[in-house]
Amino acid sequence: LKRRKFLRYNFPLTNYYTYVIKMNNRFNTEVPPLKGSKPIYAKKANLKAKWTYNSKDNINGYTDPISKTKIEMIKNIEKLYILLKKNNIKMSLAVYPWPQTLENDTVDSQHVKMWEEFCLNKCEKFINFFPYFFNEKKESSHLNVLREFYFWNDVHFNKKGNIFLGEKLADVF
């Protein structure tokens, strides 16, 4: 742990490339294959996404109830809002689905509702990307949307996904 902290703070690039090599499936057989018939996400990512589509307040693997966690998230964004307002900076907020959310949730996600409600009378703009992705899913399939817009086995957008989001943001602004 000490070595990792030392590397992280004193040699960030070395630390990053050590991580990349460690996670590269040519060197680590624990990493899922780059392309399978269905993506395999890290357990932590699956757990992190679960609250958005799970109706239970207590989810196995979470330390606190979801209701408490939501309050914490809102408090943190509220602090950001106050800081921005104090500096005369307008706040806009965008929400988009993670792959797990896209697979297991609906366009009217509690995730969307929570941030939309927060943005009332606070945000310059609230940008909801859920309808775009759920529409794409409806027109093709969940897996096709993942292949087209996300890195496989990852919750992040690929180049095409980022271009897609950028074009939608350009339309809004």
Regions found by a protein language model. Give the residues of each.
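Short glycine/proline- and charge-enriched loop/turn segments
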Residues: 61, 141-152
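Serine-dependent acyl-ester chemistry module
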Residues: 1-117, 124, 129-140
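Flexible, active-site-adjacent loop/turn segments at secondary-structure boundaries
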Residues: 100, 131, 148-149, 155
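Glycine-rich loops and low-complexity Gly/Arg-rich segments
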Residues: 116-120, 152-154
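Histidine-centered active-site loop/cap adjacent to the catalytic His
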Residues: 149-173
